[in-house]
């Protein structure tokens, strides 16, 4: 099983502000959907609350120390029990938030990274990557357009 993280960050590693993403980029949402559909997605409670609903065509697992009940969502109280629950899948995706990324980035096999080519204010950050540990498997640059305010770089990184 491949353990992957998927995240969008600014150049200053911002991933959120006030429990929301401080940008709206349809290109990144499409990238996220393309790379997570059909796979189990693991997220923290705050990330689920910011999304507001289970993601369709995915097994939605919410990690929380406290019992969490919501239709279409599986609650687990530990990362290990979540992984054990979806152990038969080829790939599992950790989709946030900040604390889980910090804790589990060192264990990740793969990273789907959207680099938003700007710096923004935020209160939640992705850890600084050590690029020596990663090999670029995919790299696509997309210029800003009428729907996407910022240039984006879409990367798939695999651990060396």
UniProtKB/Swiss-Prot annotation:
<keyword id="KW-0046">Antibiotic resistance</keyword>
<comment type="similarity">
    <text>Belongs to the dihydrofolate reductase family.</text>
</comment>
<protein>
    <recommendedName>
        <fullName>Dihydrofolate reductase</fullName>
        <ecNumber>1.5.1.3</ecNumber>
    </recommendedName>
</protein>
<dbReference type="Pfam" id="PF00186">
    <property type="entry name" value="DHFR_1"/>
</dbReference>
<dbReference type="GO" id="GO:0050661">
    <property type="term" value="F:NADP binding"/>
</dbReference>
<keyword id="KW-0560">Oxidoreductase</keyword>
<keyword id="KW-0817">Trimethoprim resistance</keyword>
<dbReference type="InterPro" id="IPR012259">
    <property type="entry name" value="DHFR"/>
</dbReference>
<dbReference type="GO" id="GO:0046655">
    <property type="term" value="P:folic acid metabolic process"/>
</dbReference>
<feature type="binding site">
    <location>
        <position position="6"/>
    </location>
    <ligand>
        <name>substrate</name>
    </ligand>
</feature>
<feature type="binding site">
    <location>
        <position position="114"/>
    </location>
    <ligand>
        <name>substrate</name>
    </ligand>
</feature>
<feature type="binding site">
    <location>
        <begin position="14"/>
        <end position="20"/>
    </location>
    <ligand>
        <name>NADP(+)</name>
    </ligand>
</feature>
<dbReference type="GO" id="GO:0004146">
    <property type="term" value="F:dihydrofolate reductase activity"/>
</dbReference>
<feature type="domain" description="DHFR">
    <location>
        <begin position="2"/>
        <end position="159"/>
    </location>
</feature>
<dbReference type="GO" id="GO:0046654">
    <property type="term" value="P:tetrahydrofolate biosynthetic process"/>
</dbReference>
<keyword id="KW-0521">NADP</keyword>
<feature type="binding site">
    <location>
        <position position="58"/>
    </location>
    <ligand>
        <name>substrate</name>
    </ligand>
</feature>
<feature type="binding site">
    <location>
        <position position="28"/>
    </location>
    <ligand>
        <name>substrate</name>
    </ligand>
</feature>
<dbReference type="GO" id="GO:0046452">
    <property type="term" value="P:dihydrofolate metabolic process"/>
</dbReference>
<keyword id="KW-0554">One-carbon metabolism</keyword>
<dbReference type="GO" id="GO:0005829">
    <property type="term" value="C:cytosol"/>
</dbReference>
<feature type="binding site">
    <location>
        <begin position="96"/>
        <end position="103"/>
    </location>
    <ligand>
        <name>NADP(+)</name>
    </ligand>
</feature>
<dbReference type="InterPro" id="IPR024072">
    <property type="entry name" value="DHFR-like_dom_sf"/>
</dbReference>
<comment type="function">
    <text>Key enzyme in folate metabolism. Catalyzes an essential reaction for de novo glycine and purine synthesis, and for DNA precursor synthesis.</text>
</comment>
<feature type="binding site">
    <location>
        <begin position="46"/>
        <end position="47"/>
    </location>
    <ligand>
        <name>NADP(+)</name>
    </ligand>
</feature>
<dbReference type="GO" id="GO:0046677">
    <property type="term" value="P:response to antibiotic"/>
</dbReference>
<dbReference type="InterPro" id="IPR017925">
    <property type="entry name" value="DHFR_CS"/>
</dbReference>
<feature type="binding site">
    <location>
        <position position="8"/>
    </location>
    <ligand>
        <name>NADP(+)</name>
    </ligand>
</feature>
<feature type="binding site">
    <location>
        <begin position="64"/>
        <end position="65"/>
    </location>
    <ligand>
        <name>NADP(+)</name>
    </ligand>
</feature>
<comment type="pathway">
    <text>Cofactor biosynthesis; tetrahydrofolate biosynthesis; 5,6,7,8-tetrahydrofolate from 7,8-dihydrofolate: step 1/1.</text>
</comment>
<dbReference type="InterPro" id="IPR001796">
    <property type="entry name" value="DHFR_dom"/>
</dbReference>
<dbReference type="GO" id="GO:0006730">
    <property type="term" value="P:one-carbon metabolic process"/>
</dbReference>
<feature type="binding site">
    <location>
        <position position="53"/>
    </location>
    <ligand>
        <name>substrate</name>
    </ligand>
</feature>
């Amino acid at each position: 099983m491949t353990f992957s993280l998927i995240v969008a960050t600014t150049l200053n590693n911002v991933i959120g502000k006030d429990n929301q993403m401080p940008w709206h980029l349809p290109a990144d949402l499409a990238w996220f959907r393309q790379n997570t559909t059909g796979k189990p997605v693991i997220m923290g409670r705050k990330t689920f609350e910011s999304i507001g609903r289970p993601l369709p065509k995915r097994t939605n697992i919410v990690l929380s120390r406290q019992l969490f009940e919501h239709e279409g969502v599986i609650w687990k109280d530990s990362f290990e029990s979540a992984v054990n629950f979806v152990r038969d899948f080829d790939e599992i995706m950790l989709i946030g938030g900040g604390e889980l990324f910090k804790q589990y980035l060192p264990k990740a096999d793969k990273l789907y990274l959207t680099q938003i080519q700007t710096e923004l204010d935020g209160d939640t950050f992705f850890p600084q990557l050590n690029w020596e540990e990663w090999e670029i498997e995919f790299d696509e640059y997309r210029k800003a357009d009428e729907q996407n305010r910022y240039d984006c770089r879409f990367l798939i990184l695999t651990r060396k």
